[in-house]
Amino acid sequence: MTLSAHVSIAHPAWMDITGPDGAVTHGADQDWFPDLWQQRAGCGPTAAAVILSYLARTRPELAPLYPEGAMDRASFTGLMCRVWEHVTPVSHGLNRPEQMAEGMASFAAARGLTLTPGLFVCPSARTKRPPYEQVEA
């Protein structure tokens, strides 16, 4: 299957999170983690939590990834902390995409689900990259 020139998220508002003051953020913030190290190194686990919650909302069979489904900051921070246990940065963060994919698969497995995250291999040299139109999903 070839990707079209237009790729988008079907329901971006489903990633909105309401803060304690009623303000809405589009996605999560690693600064919500309770621990300073998590705040500094938590970009990967934060992104993983957003992805996993979106999958839980958009695919009923993946609802166990975030069964609460609550999109308030306190509840979502709880999800971020649970995801951290599987998508855990090392001293240099998540410096390989495989670390994030493996951690997300581990999080799903702990909930009785099989999740097979795909990785898009992109050569570092621009001249070796395929044209966008030839990239397959």
Describe these PLM feature segments.
Residues G103-A110, L115-P117:
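Mid-length scaffold segments of soluble, non-membrane domains
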Residues A125-A137:
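Active-site-adjacent substructure of cysteine-protease-like catalytic cores
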Residues L115-R126:
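Acidic carboxylate-rich catalytic motifs and surrounding loops in phosphoryl-/glycosyl-chemistry enzymes
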Residues M1-S106:
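Active-site-adjacent structural segments surrounding the nucleophilic cysteine of cysteine proteases
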